[in-house]
Amino acid sequence: MASFIVLAHFSCEWAIKVVLLHHYLSYKNMAYNLLKGKRGIIFGALNDMSIAWKVAERCVEEGATIALSNTEMALRMGEVDELAKKLNAPVIAADATNFEDLENVFTKAQELLGGKIDFVLHSIGMSPNVRKRRTYDDLDYNWLNKTLDISAISF
């Protein structure tokens, strides 16, 4: 209660922001077991700046059992093994443009996680133009098509 008395010295708008921040900090680390017993595959975690990385952490906090997937190259370049160890999650390499690889991910994930897959997160973002450090005014349209295929259309 003492923390709210101090707020009386600030403007109402400032007080509301502080109260909201307090509630956010109080609840952000709480888990509600929303995904308890669910199994999922998360595609695209590369490092702790990846959306997929943060979603994977939160899914496990909420009770899910997950498998992680990315390309062989991304697995070599990134820090996925660190996340896998932290979350006790298997890592299954796959090329999202290869149907056989995707079938393999689902088959292996079901075996490793012990049952059907309840959810999938497609968070694969890829651009050969960026990786090859080409500016967008020097765009290679074949690479652009591959970018769209992988980032927006794959599976």
Locate each region found by the language model:
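Conserved glycine-rich Rossmann-like NAD(P)H-binding loop of the short-chain dehydrogenase/reductase
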Residues: 64-80
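Glycine/Thr-rich phosphate-binding loops of Rossmann-like dinucleotide-binding domains
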Residues: 50, 76, 128-131
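Conserved mid-core segment of classical short-chain dehydrogenase/reductases
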Residues: 81-88, 92-94, 98-103, 107-147
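Short hydrophobic targeting helices and cationic amphipathic motifs
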Residues: 7-10, 23-25
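Canonical Rossmann dinucleotide-binding motif of NAD(H)/NADP(H)-dependent dehydrogenases/reductases
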Residues: 32-68
